[in-house]
């Protein structure tokens, strides 16, 4: 199980590297502080929903997007579940479950590349969703999506321009 302190440290480290994003992540940070103080969650389903996901970039600068019914395609992410000690491990497991068998972390990019905030899906209630995203690399030929699978390669610039700029910067410099 990913310890609450691991998530708190991840958010803290991320906001120190990107102070301009601190106001957006403040509700999550406040909730984590309240949980630590109380020793548990007493918010009855109103806490920010935290998910984790890989931003899998191939040699063509494309990422696999997941389509789901009528909903628009989006970057893969999943709720935190039992069995993982780190957020990175959970992101890698999701990538492998999608058919990305051979993947590696871009050198210098061991920390999340993005903490993406959005409104949670309707079935999750009226609350914030925070996707902890890790940059991982692969080659398209090493991915084995099942026939009819919901994954589709999409140019990163069509997904999220800010994320594309951040990925370009990381890949060019290896800097945090």
Show where each model-derived region lies.
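Active-site segment of metal-dependent pyrophosphate-handling enzymes
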Residues: 96-142
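NUDIX/MutT-family hydrolases
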Residues: 133-174
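Actinobacteria-biased recognition of intrinsically disordered, low-complexity terminal regions
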Residues: 1-11, 173-176
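Short connector loops at helix/strand junctions that flank enzyme active sites
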Residues: 47-52, 70, 75, 127-129
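Conserved Nudix-box catalytic region and its N-terminal flanking loop in Nudix hydrolases
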Residues: 59-100
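Short acidic (Asp/Glu) patches
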Residues: 36-40, 51, 87, 116-121
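Acidic, metal-coordinating catalytic segment for phosphate/diphosphate chemistry
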Residues: 13-53
């Amino acid at each position: 199980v990913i310890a609450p302190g691991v998530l708190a440290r991840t958010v803290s480290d991320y906001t120190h590297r990107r102070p301009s994003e601190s106001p957006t992540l403040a509700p999550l940070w406040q909730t984590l502080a309240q949980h630590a103080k109380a020793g548990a969650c007493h918010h009855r389903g109103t806490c920010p929903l935290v998910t984790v996901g890989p931003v899998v970039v191939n040699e063509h600068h494309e990422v696999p997007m997941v389509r789901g019914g009528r909903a628009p395609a989006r970057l893969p992410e999943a709720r935190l579940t039992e069995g993982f000690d780190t957020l990175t491990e959970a992101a890698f497991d999701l990538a492998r479950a999608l058919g990305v068998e051979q993947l590696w972390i871009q050198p210098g990019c061991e920390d999340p590349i993005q903490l993406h905030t959005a409104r949670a899906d309707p079935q999750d209630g009226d609350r914030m969703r925070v996707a902890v995203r890790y940059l991982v690399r692969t080659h398209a030929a090493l991915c084995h999506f099942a026939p009819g699978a919901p994954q589709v390669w999409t140019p990163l610039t069509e997904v999220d321009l800010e994320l594309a700029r951040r990925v370009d910067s990381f890949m060019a410099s290896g800097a945090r």
